[in-house]
Amino acid sequence: MLLERIYNHVVREKQWNIGFPDKSLEELVHGASFSVRMLRHSYTDRWFADPFVLEVTDDEILLLAEDYDIHLRRGRISLLTVERNTLELKKLTPVLDVPRHLSFPCIVRRNDKVFIMPENLFGEGLTLYEFDQKTCSCRKEKVVSTQPLADAVLTDVFGKEEMLLGTYLPYDNPVLHTFVYNAQREEVRQESYVFADKTARNAGAFFECDGKLYRPAQDGKLYYGQGIVIQQVTRDETGRLAFHEVCRLSSPTTGQPSRMHTLNSYKGVTVVDMAACQHPHIARVAVQLKKHFCVIKR
């Protein structure tokens, strides 16, 4: 137990920030090398992670993201208005704050409305909120699930049915659970998928590229935020999904933060989040011990 606490402290204690890859989503899927321009901001009491792109204009990028207060040790969901040319944070607007930690604000678009479904592991579960961009406010729509799912995604990419996908803690849980809902929003089917390489946890929303469907997944084999795995997703006639790895994304250079666990894209803008360990040299030794000698086990 003591070794586990020490490992978590040196490997997982870090501050996240949002980044913008210099390559298109299509290029990333095809394995192109890339660098990342980081969000510029002056906040020292908080960090930002789990970005989803809300809107893109000629001048601005609007993001919904986890806004983590270092002193409260709790996240809320905020709207980040980013200057597109400089990637400077122009405005930070809280949009959803509850007594429990919130993160991973999955965006769901239905007709002309925008909804968000943030992770809320220790609250009432996964709640869908209608987001009003004019007032930057959220109205509770419904509780989608009371299951304590991490980094859950709600999607209708498979047609009339909606699908909820998520994992249970710990972060390296190898099982992805899916819940399928009919047009009346009634649950009609549950399934599970085991990932031996511990890439079950979502890293963002499904996306299409070159006519194919992909899922960004988290690589959690050795530690939280190890990298992102892009998986092509297919579906058979019974509704069963299949996941095929096509590429892996990790910190592009040694001069940039070494962790990455979210990727999303909308209207040609792709975002990730990245972080560096507070104790990088010790963390490197700890990871090698876990990898080669199995001294530290989760």
What is each model feature region?
Residues 1-298:
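Carbohydrate-active catalytic/glycan-binding domains of CAZyme proteins
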